[in-house]
Amino acid sequence: MVYVAFNKKTIEDIDVKGRKVLVRCDFNVPLKDGKITDENRLMGALPTIKYIMEKGGKVILCSHLGKPKGEPKQELSLAPVAKRLSELLNKEVLFPADNEVVGENAKKAVENMKDGDVILLQNTRYRKEETKNEETFSKELASLADIFVNDAFGTAHRAHCSTVGVTEFVATSVCGYLIQKELKFLGNAVENPQRPFISILGGAKVSDKINVINNLLEKVDTLIIGGGMSYTFQKAQGYTIGSSLLEEDKIDYAKEMIEKAKEKGVKLLLPVDNVAAEKFAEDAEAIITEDQNIKEGYMGLDIGPKTSKLYSQEVQSAKTVVWNGPMGVFEFEKFAKGTIEVAKAMAESQATTIIGGGDSAAAVNQLGFGDKMTHISTGGGASLEFLEGKELPGIAALNDK
């Protein structure tokens, strides 16, 4: 899979001076009362935007935000992003707010651009064609530009107009710095890791991570499992799990994976104790189980202290760690300890530490460990599909070197 990482043209392989450059960014940021609450994705886009500006290109930015389902929704307008980008770039980012995205305002704004100017188009998902990858909208986007740059790793696993369709109608399609960085870290971790290589998987469902578990068992030295998905594995081992989250139809699969780990000589670590409660609530009374078994009427909501210690020690011995998914219900303080301990062990480790986006990225940033990690992926779904060994359509569509 290294081919994905290194055989695509990048922004440095082309001349952008005086050219109109359409850049697909990932500005799908959380908003509260019209204010951006997490700027991680904006910061990630800046190197590519600045490079094109400095080289005298005309920068036309596009992105989706939320799920407007093909119609304009004021609360999902990219206006707050344009405002914040103007501040971060020290330059006005023009925002021709066309509900049809590529409307008269946008076309006129692009026509009047000077070298080094930046404009941001309206939310691409205001158009219903976007998620269906329909030719009409792809052609409209392409008509604005000479060059297309994909720098949205977070949507690289989606074949939409603004990620894949547009590449058919623009002569040159390359990747930006953010996608390069993502592929460098994730690609090296999966294909050429420094060993011991450990992967930690958490989150609620086994079904979300089936292919990831299967693929990683071919690559890792140790696989650590926590979070809601661990109870299906504990059940498969023959333990009682009370009223914990269980995917009945995945018990056999969990047994197969336990067997596969043995065959491959991979150390598979599962919880040895749990933090449980009678209800799923912030004020629920937490108990710690003595071993793997959870008694009737109780549900597991976090890994227990013995497990946290076991997992943290394992992390300390690693040279490469990839983590995707929290160890428990980290939004409730009583059930956040497992996630905190694992994050702390990674932050203190000398290893290359990679956080696979989504909830784990949120947890790490919330806990203040963000700057202690080697790389925090900007794409939850995309990084998962990458770890499954799948080709990402948004990257496959770019020009080869």
From Swiss-Prot:
Residues binding ATP, per UniProt: K209, G300, E331, G357, G358, D359, S360
Recorded GO MF terms: ADP binding; ATP binding; phosphoglycerate kinase activity
Superkingdom of this protein's organism: Bacteria
Catalytic activity from the UniProt record: (2R)-3-phosphoglycerate + ATP = (2R)-3-phospho-glyceroyl phosphate + ADP
Annotated family: Belongs to the phosphoglycerate kinase family.
Record note on quaternary structure: Monomer.
Protein name: Phosphoglycerate kinase
Organism: Clostridium tetani (strain Massachusetts / E88)
